[in-house]
């Protein structure tokens, strides 16, 4: 991103603030993360947002509808308008969740203790899974069926 002058807000900070503002209207959302090309490059195509929903938020179908609605709200809230791709962390593989938490940016945290509990449990699950994942990767790279 270009160098910002005094008093200017960097694009990532502005987008992060707008995302947090929109997400605060949805009590079912327990956390929001930015991830992907928006954080890594100037020539990003869309803005990737991962959401963690409360367990009481509803069935997978309800969560998909809610995520779609939130995506539309985020697109309307951003200026200039950008395409927003929303992923549901609760329904995603552990490896994806870990990648988002590790390389992404937390932009909405209504409950810091809840975020810490989630990320600690996720790290534990990922470390348990990591050995199996590495085994699969070795077999795949070696071309073993």
Per-segment meaning from a language model:
Residues 48-52:
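Short beta-strand->loop micro-motif that forms the acidic, two-metal-ion catalytic signature
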Residues 1-31, 39-42, 54-145:
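Catalytic core of pol beta-like nucleotidyltransferases
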Residues 43-47:
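A short, glycine/Asx- and small/polar-enriched loop/turn
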């Amino acid at each position: 991103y270009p160098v910002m002058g005094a008093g200017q807000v960097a694009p990532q900070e502005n987008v992060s603030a707008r995302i947090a503002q929109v997400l605060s209207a949805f009590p079912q959302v327990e956390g929001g993360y930015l991830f992907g090309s928006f954080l890594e490059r100037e020539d990003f195509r869309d803005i990737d947002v991962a959401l963690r929903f409360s367990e009481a938020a509803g069935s997978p179908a309800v969560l998909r509808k809610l995520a779609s609605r939130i995506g539309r709200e985020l697109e309307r809230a951003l200026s200039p308008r950008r395409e927003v791709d929303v992923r549901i962390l609760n329904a995603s593989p552990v490896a994806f969740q870990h990648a988002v938490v590790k390389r992404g940016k937390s932009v909405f945290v209504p409950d810091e203790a809840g975020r810490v509990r989630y990320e600690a449990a996720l790290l534990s699950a990922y470390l348990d899974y990591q050995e199996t994942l590495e085994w699969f990767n070795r077999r795949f790279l070696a071309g073993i069926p």
